[in-house]
Amino acid sequence: MKITDVRVRKLNDEGRMKAVVSVTFDNEFVVHDIKVIEGQNGLFIAMPSRKTPEGEFKDIAHPINSDTRNKLQKAILEEYEKAKENNSNKE
């Protein structure tokens, strides 16, 4: 699968959650609500999830290997940095 579009839908300056992103694959399939989070070791992505009745969060969709996760994270963080830069230029 090829990442064909990354859209940063919401940018946040405050808090740990920095952005909400949608990613399109092969111009045919989209995953919404991927979050860009600021952690102790820098930025990372959190896949869309839901809370189970037991209070545990489970991913709705996620990469099944680390290579795919790394490609996805790289594409998202690159687009996030561009969106952040464009947003600061508007102010």
Swiss-Prot record:
GO annotation terms (biological process): division septum assembly; sporulation resulting in formation of a cellular spore
UniProt key word Cell division: yes
UniProt cross-references to Gene3D superfamilies, sorted A to Z: Stage V sporulation protein G (3.30.1120.40)
Disulphide-bridged cysteine pairs: none
SUPFAM superfamilies xrefs: SpoVG-like
Keywords assigned by UniProt, alphabetized: Cell cycle, Cell division, Septation
InterPro entries cross-referenced by the UniProt entry: SpoVG, SpoVG_sf
Pfam name, any one: SpoVG
HAMAP family: SpoVG
Family annotation (NCBIfam families): PRK13259.1
Family label: Belongs to the SpoVG family.
Record function comment: Could be involved in septation.
Protein name, UniProt field: Putative septation protein SpoVG
Organism in which the protein naturally occurs: Caldanaerobacter subterraneus subsp. tengcongensis (strain DSM 15242 / JCM 11007 / NBRC 100824 / MB4) (Thermoanaerobacter tengcongensis)
